Amino acid sequence: MAKITTSMIQEILTAIGGKSNVIKCGNCMTRLRLTLHDDNLADRDTIKRIAGVMGLVESDDQFQIVLGPGKAQTAAEMMNEMMEGEEDNSASTTAESRDLKDVASEHKQKLKKKQTSAAQRFLSKFATIFTPLIPGFIAAGLLLGFATLLDQIYIIGNESPNANLVDLILYMKVFSKGLFSFLSILIGYNAQQAFGGSGVNGAILASLFVLGYNPDATSGIYSGMTDFFGHGIDPRGNIIGVLIAAIIGAGVEKKVRQYMPDNLDMILTSVVTLLIMGAVTFVVIMPIGGVLFQGMSWLFMNLNGNPIGSAILAGLFLISVMFGIHQGFVPVYFALMDAQGFNSLFPILAMAGAGQVGAALALYAKANKDALLRTQVKGSIIPGFLGIGEPLIYGVTLPRVKPFITACVGGAAGGFFIGLVSYMGLPVGLNTVFGPSGIVALPLMTSNAGIFAGMLVFAAGLVISYVAGFLATWFFGTKNVDLS
């Protein structure tokens, strides 16, 4: 049987209409699964004649090229690398209209092309890991927030609460408990898949952090093990350890697959990978992950707990978004959830988006009534209030540079306020790992003094960022700036 080679992948790409025609490239055990922009561009007869191609299946929106066991994953990895590593020279269309969507997309893509460093590519994979989970984070957080509101208004202090309401509150809270009880497994699956391994192997490795190793424990699922060949097991590190195990596990799996005969790949590759990575996880990753987890928690709790550190974090967050490395904060969110019971970093970083809103409003006020800038701001300001900041960043402030800087100043002012309140003894945070960053986040806020105090502090921080971003832009962000 023909081996998967670079020339073979290039032949397939040419036959399916080029890289520009590929939306998504994935695989199952035997098939290269492609989602194409236009199936009509694919030359089916040519594909079938390529050496190593065993067949072609078209199902729903997928174009499936049968390559056989042990080959499909290699082909998918090579094709993805080929598509990422080279620029697509296909002709691009240019629209005459310069609405917000066009401008934002253009500037965003220019920046993305510059993000080629290994560190940026590594951090960008965090989006692949966590983005599919965000709807669940938000849903569970909103349900928990509304349940907590009902609890504080109708249940606490009530000697005879309504039984149905109590059941409803417990029902609304159970989703959050379920999510966080087994979240590590979901992350392990996504992480190993994002780095080129099999998701199920990552999920199994992540489950080692969820299982219990104390037979006398009254909660959790006992693993049946108390030690690993005499080496004590301490499943610390949680999400940090899971990420390390899944990333290394993906590398081990790919290396094992290189030496595994094709006909044994489906049976033995995962077996060998799990045996190797299980031992590495118990002996090395769990202890290291625990130290990193504790260190990360300590560092950001101290940064969050003082106004200067919070101002710096909020002020620089938009720059991290611009370079695509903001997903690197997500493991910190987990560390803070574990240490504090809520995500105290998220509301600080959310001030950055509020600063953008204030800056955009100042630009709107300064621009002429018939200016295109006003149209762009109108199209992006409502999403900005709701915590969706990319249209403002890439379409309004960043192309004009100065307003982007003054927006960062506005975010820093709000971050300073949140940090000051925390320094005075009232840290606030999100009740879930991740959520919306605008006014929609209000029901998800909590604090040591309860949900109402958390909501009030967050709302005040938003207002401060709006005002500071507006004033900084009004006085310092519009001189020699295109307001047309």
Swiss-Prot record:
InterPro entries xrefs: Glu_permease_IIB, PTrfase_EIIB_Cys, PTS_EIIC, PTS_EIIC_1, PTS_IIB_1, PTS_Sugar-Specific_Components
Q: Where is this region: Disordered?
A: 83-106
Compositionally biased, Basic and acidic residues: which spans? Answer: 96-106
Q: Which Pfam families match?
A: PTS_EIIB, PTS_EIIC
PTS EIIB type-1 domain: which residues?
1-89
Keywords from the UniProt entry: Cell inner membrane, Cell membrane, Kinase, Membrane, Phosphotransferase system, Sugar transport, Transferase, Transmembrane, Transmembrane helix, Transport
**Listed transmembrane segments:** 126-146, 168-188, 194-214, 232-252, 273-293, 312-332, 345-365, 379-399, 404-424, 451-471
Q: How does it sit in the membrane?
A: Multi-pass membrane protein
| Residues forming the catalytic site | 28 (phosphocysteine intermediate)
Q: What is its EC number?
A: 2.7.1.192
Where in or outside the cell it occurs: the entry states: Cell inner membrane
Which molecular function terms from Gene Ontology are attached?
Answer: kinase activity; protein-N(PI)-phosphohistidine-sugar phosphotransferase activity; protein-phosphocysteine-N-acetylmuramate phosphotransferase system transporter activity
Annotated GO biological process = phosphoenolpyruvate-dependent sugar phosphotransferase system
All residue ranges annotated as the PTS EIIC type-1 domain in the record: 124-484
Q: What catalytic reaction does the record list?
A: N-acetyl-beta-D-muramate(out) + N(pros)-phospho-L-histidyl-[protein] = N-acetyl-beta-D-muramate 6-phosphate(in) + L-histidyl-[protein]
Name any GO cellular component annotation: plasma membrane
CDD domains in UniProt: PTS_IIB_glc
Give the matching Gene3D superfamilies: Glucose permease domain IIB
Tell me which SUPFAM superfamilies the record gives.
Glucose permease domain IIB
Q: What does the function comment of this entry state?
A: The phosphoenolpyruvate-dependent sugar phosphotransferase system (sugar PTS), a major carbohydrate active transport system, catalyzes the phosphorylation of incoming sugar substrates concomitantly with their translocation across the cell membrane. This system is involved in N-acetylmuramic acid (MurNAc) transport, yielding cytoplasmic MurNAc-6-P. Is also able to take up anhydro-N-acetylmuramic acid (anhMurNAc), but cannot phosphorylate the carbon 6, probably because of the 1,6-anhydro ring.
Per the record, the domain comment is: The EIIB domain is phosphorylated by phospho-EIIA on a cysteinyl or histidyl residue, depending on the transported sugar. Then, it transfers the phosphoryl group to the sugar substrate concomitantly with the sugar uptake processed by the EIIC domain.
Q: What is this protein called?
A: PTS system N-acetylmuramic acid-specific EIIBC component
Protein's organism: Aliivibrio fischeri (strain ATCC 700601 / ES114)
